[in-house]
Regions:
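Long, contiguous binding/interaction regions
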Residues: 83-87, 100, 138, 151
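Conserved beta-strand-loop-alpha-helix junction that forms the acyl-donor binding cleft
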Residues: 126-137
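Conserved catalytic-core motifs of GNAT/GCN5-like acyltransferases
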Residues: 89, 127-128, 145-156
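Conserved acetyl-CoA-binding loop-helix of GNAT-fold acetyltransferases
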Residues: 101-115, 136-141
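Active-site rim helix/loop that mediates acceptor-substrate recognition in acyltransferases
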Residues: 46-66, 73-74
């Protein structure tokens, strides 16, 4: 099992994109998970998260793997626009709706794959609902291949 205690505080990806080690910032992240459309993309249900559920999710991801915020520079200012995690052989990602369809997800996925390689992972899985076309496209563009109806795998 990888040693997650050595998780870097930042992973620089591009001049306008970096991954930042998770820290509690629910004022920013709770609105993402209260968006019914985004909840459907993530969990296939439109039920928004409450604060307790959000805390449980982040606690699980950050103690069983590596969890990062996706930080994007837009018009000269840095913004947290989503999160991405490596946990139990899989990657998961959320981009808030106002920053979707800008290539941020694809680039963040490529960056987290580099991190998985550093950790010695041989493959990374992603479960993506069949209706989530934009996420499927991002994972395929990052080099994943579809191995099941909703299963995608990246091999090193």
């Amino acid at each position: 099992m990888p040693d997650y205690s050595a998780q870097p505080k930042k992973i620089f990806l591009y001049d306008n994109l970096e991954l930042v080690k998770y820290y509690p910032y629910y004022k920013r992240t709770l609105p993402w998970y209260q968006d019914p459309t985004l909840c459907r993309q993530v969990d296939n249900r439109e039920e928004p998260y409450d604060l307790a559920r959000l805390k449980r999710m982040y606690r699980f991801l950050s103690t069983n793997g590596e969890c990062y915020y996706i930080k994007f520079r837009d018009h000269g200012r840095w913004h947290l626009v989503g999160d991405i995690s490596l946990c139990r052989g899989a990657v998961s990602i959320v981009i808030c709706r106002e920053y979707q369809n800008r290539g941020i997800g694809r680039r963040a996925i490529s960056g987290i794959l580099r991190r998985a390689g550093e950790l010695g992972w041989r493959q990374v899985k992603a479960e993506i609902y069949s209706f989530n076309d934009q996420s499927r496209k991002a994972f395929l563009a990052a080099g994943f291949r579809q191995t099941g109806k909703e299963t995608f795998v990246y091999g090193f």
